[in-house]
Amino acid sequence: MQSSLLGRMTGVTGSRSKRHTKFRLRRLQQPPTESTTRLASPDDAQPIEETKSQEHLEQSATQGLSEASGDNNAGGAHPTPAPNEGDAPTVAELQHGSNDRVDDGTSGSGTVSGWKLAAVLIGLSLAVFCMSLDSTVLSTAIPKITAEFNSLHDMAWYVSAYNLTISSFSLVYGKIYSLYRVKWVYLTTLFLFEAGSLVCGAAPSSLALIIGRAIAGVGGAGVFLGSMLIVHEIMPLHQVPLFIALISGLYGIASVVGPLLGGVFTDYVSWRWCFYINLPIGGLTAFIIVLFVRPRVREKATVKKTPWAQLLDLDPLGIILILPAVMCMLLVLQWGGAKYAWSNWRIIVLLVMAGSLALTFTAVQLWQGERATIPPRIVRNRSVWGAIAFSVCIYGSFTVFTYYLPIWFQAIKSVSATRSGVMNLPMILGVVVCSMLSGWGVSRVGYYVPFMYMAPVVGSIGAGLLTTLHVFSGPAAWITYQLLLGVGIGSGMALPLVAVQTALPTDDVSTGSAIITFTQSLSGALFNFVAQSVFQSRLVHNLNAALPGVDTARVADVSPREIRNAIEPEYLPQTLEAYSLAITQVFYAGTALCTLALFGVLPIKCLSVKGSRIPPMAHA
């Protein structure tokens, strides 16, 4: 009887011990609180470390399991084998769920390696190159297109329809990519880009060509952003900067190759091949992505929702507001002072609409919170708004010099548009090579902030030297100055995306990347307009000062190549001096922007890409 009673008492004790252990394990599986986890400030959105209380709870749980096992054995139960060290759940696993390990920065569920990784990177690079090529390839083909369609009045829309939709849809895709699997969204946008290219190539009229360009722009915005996000998912974090640098370099190459390739197609085949060339390349990229990329399941997509709830998650009100706001602003920048006077009612209406829609969009984003296209907490992250400021300044400066250095060569050195592009190669090559080197350096060292400081320091020296160009400047001067500028800008151009992808939780990377790409494209359009306004005003002023009593209006209105035909030979030296001075005065704006980029680096946190990735929803 005593033996039986002792056995029942031991069984009760073992049951209580197991129930107590399960209770403690349930406590560990609950979301972390202030007593278990210390979080960084909201602007960092990054977990720091687990406290000693977590270690104590984990040890208690393990001890409880041992006690329960011992009690069961005492009661005559079968012994429970001790778990292997590798099988024991960590605190991070207990907090996030046993099937949701925190990414250690070296691998992920979709990691690709070896020749498969090389194939994916080549496919993505080709797609991005085609997308960026479409921005410049028509510059030499437009005369042939307008002659075929008899559509000189539509000439500006062949370029604008593409650029407008790319800029407008960048933020929209940031939201879509954050909610759905990157692989399938990317393939959809690639299909849109290819469909738009097909429409352009087969266009029977000018209107069809414009529509095709708009469709291609809608897809192109998603292709660029999606390429960055696929790389973020399939590669270790410390290798991502190298590919992002490659993409930035491809943009520089496309700006030079585009006009040359467009001229070759137009002269020897047909202008339609400017678009048909995208079809086989896009098909190859799609085949590679389908075959080798495994999409990561996003945490936000794991919760089953009704179709109405899914629609609300897309922030339809924000999308309805931001698309026309961006389009109105870009039309103002394109038409103001060029096609229409600033006092024209069309420009005034567009300005009012752009401002009103932008203010309403901001209010909606604050009201929507986590459902917003741009959640306010992401913008409050100091690394994000620092990267935004840096991008605006660096891309604005790059735009100024990219557009106006060729004009200086054409006007002052009397070379063709093609030749001026070749003479602009020192800056472009400097950007491409140093962009790659900085990406490699970040991958090796781990820290991107030092390279970002290098951009405004070296770049502003080269930009400042370019303001000293004059009519008699030789190749030694303009080649050296361009190289310095290219080295500076290239060393930091790709790194705002790296900073954002490192500083944000995984599920916020798409939104953060979209914000950066949007500000880059918008700053390019904005400062191109600023440069144009400075150039036109200073050119008229300089010509009037150099040639008093001479009608200088016709000189100010002609293309750079036609200056020598628009003025009498005896006035040509003064005219060239005035023209050169006006362009170098534009370079002052580019120099100021490059210098101001330094202040964008200051708030960016000096994190390492070799550290752990921030787990999804670490900001909660």
From Swiss-Prot:
Positions of transmembrane segments: 117-137, 157-179, 191-211, 215-235, 242-262, 273-293, 317-337, 347-367, 388-408, 422-442, 445-465, 478-498, 515-535, 581-601
Polar residues: bias regions: 30-39, 59-72
GO biological process: transmembrane transport
Keyword Membrane: yes
Coiled coil: none
Recorded GO CC terms: plasma membrane
Basic and acidic residues bias spans: 49-58
Lipid bilayer topology: Multi-pass membrane protein
GO MF entry, a single one: transmembrane transporter activity
Compartment(s): Membrane
Main location: membrane
Biased composition (Basic residues): 16-27
PANTHER family to which the protein is assigned, alphabetical: MAJOR FACILITATOR SUPERFAMILY, MFS EFFLUX TRANSPORTER INPD-RELATED
Family to which the UniProt record says this protein belongs: Belongs to the major facilitator superfamily. TCR/Tet family.
Other comment: In A.calidoustus, the austinoid gene cluster lies on a contiguous DNA region, while clusters from E.nidulans and P.brasilianum are split in their respective genomes. Genetic rearrangements provoked variability among the clusters and E.nidulans produces the least number of austionoid derivatives with the end products austinol and dehydroaustinol, while P.brasilianum can produce until acetoxydehydroaustin, and A.calidoustus produces the highest number of identified derivatives.
Function: MFS-type transporter; part of the gene cluster B that mediates the biosynthesis of austinol and dehydroaustinol, two fungal meroterpenoids.
Protein name, per record: MFS-type transporter ausY
Protein encoded by which gene: ausY
